[in-house]
């Protein structure tokens, strides 16, 4: 679990960190002794000192299959006192048909934020180091929803049509893409949004 006294959660740093591997330092970091400088640096950036604010919550790692086919790392963090925010960090890894020689390898990091006082919920996710057979799989998704005086709902997987003006507050999203060929003489890529 995580206990951070007199600290807040910088969701903007976490959101940017989805693309840079910041969750590696928070959710069950590999080899914490060797990676301690990077882990402490990331933790200081994500959880900066803030008097009177506290962040607590459990973390869990779920594995399914023997050998493991699916691994899900989750953290449910609550920032107290009011205004209360709930932050969910997630990391998914799917290796099919087995870990030693996966034909399908999907890795995704995700961040969810429920801000009770702002009456909003957001979810961001990004694929990294993913492939189907030898073809690289990439892409981002974002969800924004609000209730109360300004209800809204936006869900984008792979971004928007180039001529569509994206609503404010959404990050630039990479297309959901499968790279079929990436050579000097031939490039073939399937993209969707």
List where the protein language model places each region.
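Extended assembly/interaction regions that build large supramolecular complexes
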Residues: 1-193
């Amino acid at each position: 679990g995580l206990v951070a006294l007199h600290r807040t959660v910088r969701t903007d740093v976490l959101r940017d960190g989805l693309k840079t591997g910041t969750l590696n330092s928070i959710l069950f970091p590999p080899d914490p002794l060797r990676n301690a400088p990077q882990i402490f640096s990331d933790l200081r950036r994500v959880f900066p000192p803030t008097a009177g604010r506290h962040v607590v919550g459990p973390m869990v790692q779920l594995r399914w299959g023997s050998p493991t086919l699916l691994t899900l790392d989750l953290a449910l963090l609550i920032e107290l006192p009011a205004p209360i925010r709930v932050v969910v960090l997630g990391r998914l890894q799917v290796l099919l048909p087995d870990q030693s020689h996966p034909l399908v390898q999907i890795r995704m990091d995700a961040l969810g934020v429920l801000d009770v006082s702002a009456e909003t919920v957001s979810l961001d996710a990004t694929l990294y180091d993913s492939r189907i057979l030898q073809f690289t799989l990439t892409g981002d998704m974002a969800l924004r929803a609000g209730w109360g005086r300004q209800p809204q709902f936006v869900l984008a997987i792979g971004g928007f049509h180039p001529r569509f003006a994206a609503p404010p507050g959404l990050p630039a999203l990479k297309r959901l893409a499968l790279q079929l060929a990436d050579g000097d003489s031939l490039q073939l890529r399937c993209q969707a949004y």
